[in-house]
Swiss-Prot record:
One GO cellular component term noted in the UniProt record for this chain: cytosol
Motif (PY-motif): 460-463, 625-628
Protein name per Swiss-Prot or TrEMBL: Protein ROG3
A molecular-function term among this protein's GO annotations: ubiquitin protein ligase binding
Subunit comment: Interacts with RSP5 via its 2 PY-motifs.
Designated gene of the protein: ROG3
Length: 733
């Protein structure tokens, strides 16, 4: 975010941005071909935050699409010859705005009057969080222009946060964005302009968005098989097929190659599969420029071995026992492989037709080497057309647009964004949708691993293999529990106390066997897990080794069904059975780490994201949770005061609460003592005259330290006088 100064360096808003709702990374997704795709809703708000009053005339917003084509005027051979010279190649630029949608200007008077009616202030807000302010216009469909009047008047916005909502219906026939093709681009941008008074320059906020198109789940291309069958006379009969014509960018597609040799002694050599991208572009004038670029390739040096699997004990292949290692003559060669499509939109573009200017298609080309009996090599070539499309179920990486969230002024040119100096990292599209299929998808995408095919992501599960499911016999078996983890429904339901004890007993037996095997083999002890074994021994009832021998639980010790999947080999190293603290591990010891963990990726968690990245992820919702200050306030109950009791010969015990020991009570109890006449004794054996004298001395000597220091004695004296007066009245009666 950057502002350039005009006539005044003041009056710059703290925030001026365009925010879209219900979109992922500012991507508008169209579903279906242009003639069948439904319309989509585009909604959002213009966010403005100012720290001082600002006078503005109008706020406008528009969405426009732009196509840019650079047509070279020289042929490739001429360009190569001219590259030797210092003169740059000649090109013809073609720029055109093919789509423009403008919203009505915000009626500021109605907006401010609505705010005054709600809060009595012209948009002022005490909250500094923009997400917490709920200041919205009265209507988004009937916004009137302020520029129509002869003398446009300005309105004053007080200090605070503002958001101006907008919405529009976009047609489904919009051309899609194209960014990574050389010499041709299709981009969409939103532009908001705040027109201010003549003393200040206008403010402009631009935000680039992407319009991407995907195919509908009912499209024929998702289930259409592409196949090429042909024959090379006296050589081979071949068949190459792909199960789905439409392949999502970032996914994988299986490839089947079937070759029948027609001559004896013919051997199969290497196979190369290349994905080519053909794109054509032109401006309104001829000619049409057609170019190709390679997207990815797959090399199979030994296709029979690589496609058939591993060797078994008999020297044959597991998946196809008819294949022999010497590549002798067979009746048929079957090769099944998988081609991984790059997950970056910077390397390839989806199949598209943008107006009559840009056309993109993709094709798979196969190069198969055949080794003849005399030793010379022949090459078989074939091609298959496929369709690449963008799927919201697969996360894609793309380079961010440089002009995103660009702030500029009308009076200035060649502005530079402050964030442009920073290194541009690739951002990921549809990362939220991909998280539904599992976090492993993003991890495999970053590490270059395989990604599930699009048919696995878009189609419902296939139940034709249900005949191999294990039937429930009505009795509880240990096999069903062992094949299910503790976090699965089966493991959580059947994991009783007896089962856990049985599991611990089995684990204790296996650990004992492992220890005996290590002792018999004479393995050297390790000084790493003495404390680890001791911490685990009380639970498993396994005696802790005294020599500090390290105990490792291999896969074989856990049983055949302990977390392993048939046909899948685990790359995870053995894990120490240890819960000891870090200080118990020596400094020179390296603990085994699972190969799937990628610790350098965790370094990104320490980086503070930029404003653009932070706003693209709705971790914090628009509505903040309510606060409950009364409920969370820690109110400590008051402790009641203690009243001490003295001997009855001097004072009387009292149980009166502290709150009632006030001066008013003492003054009211002193009056009966003044009306006492005569010398009478109370039931307690205390002379009433003595009490009167004591009371009079206390009243005449206010500086008595003894009475000041003992308020309990003063209260007891008053109480005694009250009781003496009461007794004297009774005697008179």
């Amino acid at each position: 975010m950057g502002f350039s100064s005009g006539k005044s360096t003041k009056k710059k808003p703290l925030l001026f941005d365009i925010r879209l709702k219900n979109v992922d990374n500012d991507v508008i997704l169209l579903k279906g071909p242009p003639n069948e795709a439904p319309s989509v809703l585009l909604s959002g708000c213009i966010v403005l935050s100012i720290n001082e009053p600002m006078q503005i005339k109008s706020i406008s917003l528009r969405l426009y699409g732009k196509i840019q084509i650079d047509v070279p005027l020289e042929r490739p051979q001429d360009a190569s010859s001219s590259s030797l010279s210092s003169s740059p190649p000649k090109i013809r630029k073609y720029n055109k705005v093919f789509y423009n949608y403008a919203w009505d200007n915000v009626n500021l008077k109605e907006y401010l009057s609505g705010l005054r009616g709600q809060s009595g202030l012209a948009g002022s807000s005490s909250s500094s969080n923009i997400l917490g302010t709920r200041q919205r216009a009265q209507s988004t469909s009937s916004l009137k222009s302020l520029k129509g009047s002869s003398s446009p008047s300005s309105c004053t916005l007080d200090k605070g946060n503002y958001d101006f909502p907008f919405s529009a219906i976009l047609p489904g026939s919009l051309p899609e964005s194209v960014e990574s093709l050389p010499n041709c681009f299709v981009t969409y941008s939103m532009e908001s302009v705040i027109e201010r008074s003549k003393n200040y320059s206008d403010l402009i906020c631009r935000k680039n968005i992407r319009v991407l198109r995907t195919i509908s789940p009912a499209a024929v291309e998702l289930s259409e098989t592409v196949c090429v069958d042909n024959s090379w006379p006296d050589k081979v009969d071949y068949s190459i097929s792909v199960p789905n014509k439409a392949v999502a960018i970032g996914s994988a597609t299986p490839i089947n190659i079937s070759i029948v040799p027609l001559s004896k002694g013919l051997k199969l050599g290497s196979i190369k599969v290349v994905l080519f991208e053909n794109y054509q572009y032109c401006d309104p004038f001829p000619p049409v420029i057609s170019e190709n670029r390679q997207v990815t390739e797959l090399n199979l040096e030994d296709p029979l071995n690589e496609s058939s699997g591993e060797f078994n004990g008999n020297g044959c292949f597991v998946n196809n026992p008819f294949f022999q290692p010497d590549h002798s003559f067979q009746d048929k060669w079957e090769i099944d492989t998988i081609l991984q499509i790059p997950n970056s939109l910077s390397n390839c573009v989806q199949d598209c037709d943008v107006r009559s200017n840009i056309k993109v298609r993709h094709k798979l080309k196969f190069f198969i080497i055949l080794i003849n009996p005399d030793g010379h090599k022949s090459e078989l070539r074939a091609s298959l057309p496929i369709q690449l499309f963008i799927s919201p179920f697969v996360a894609l990486s793309i380079k961010p647009l440089s002009s995103s969230n660009l702030y500029s002024l009308f009076s200035t040119t060649n502005q530079k964004d402050e964030n442009s100096s920073q290194e541009e990292e690739e951002e990921y599209l549809f990362s939220r949708s991909a998280s539904v299929t599992g976090l492993e998808l993003l991890a495999d995408m970053r590490s270059g691993g395989s990604v599930p095919t699009i048919s696995d992501l878009m189609t419902p599960p296939n139940y034709e293999m249900h005949v191999y499911d294990r039937l429930y016999s009505g009795s509880f078996t240990r096999t069903a529990v062992e094949t299910s983890g503790t976090c699965t429904p089966l493991g959580s339901e059947c994991s009783t106390v007896e089962d856990q004890q049985q599991d611990l007993e089995d684990l204790r037996i296996r650990l004992t066997k492992i220890r005996n095997q290590r002792d018999n083999l004479g393995l050297p002890p390790s000084a790493s897990s003495a404390a680890a074994s001791r911490s685990l021994s009380p639970l498993l009832n396994v005696p802790a080794p005294e020599d500090g021998t390290e105990r490792i639980l291999p896969q074989s010790a856990l049983g055949p069904n302990s977390g392993s999947v048939p046909g899948v080999h685990s790359n995870v190293s053995p894990v120490l059975l240890s819960r000891s603290p870090a200080p118990s591990v020596s400094a020179h010891e390296v603990l085994p780490v699972p190969s799937g963990l990628n610790y350098p990726e965790t370094q990104n968690l320490n980086k503070v994201p930029s404003y653009g990245k932070a706003m693209k992820y709705d971790i914090i919702g628009e509505d903040l949770p309510p606060s409950y200050p009364c409920a969370i306030q820690n109110v400590q109950p008051r402790k009641p005061s203690r009243v001490h009791s003295r001997n009855s010969s001097t004072t009387l015990s009292s149980s009166i609460p502290t709150s009632f020991h006030s001066s008013s009570f003492m003054s009211s109890t002193a009056s009966p003592i003044s009306i006492i006449n005569g010398s009478r004794s109370s039931s307690s054996g205390v002379s009433l005259n003595t009490l009167n004298e004591l009371t009079s001395k206390t009243s005449n000597n206010p500086s008595s330290n003894s009475m000041k220091r003992s308020p309990t004695r003063r209260r007891a004296t008053s109480l005694a006088g009250f009781m003496g007066g009461f007794l004297s009245k009774g005697n008179k009666r």
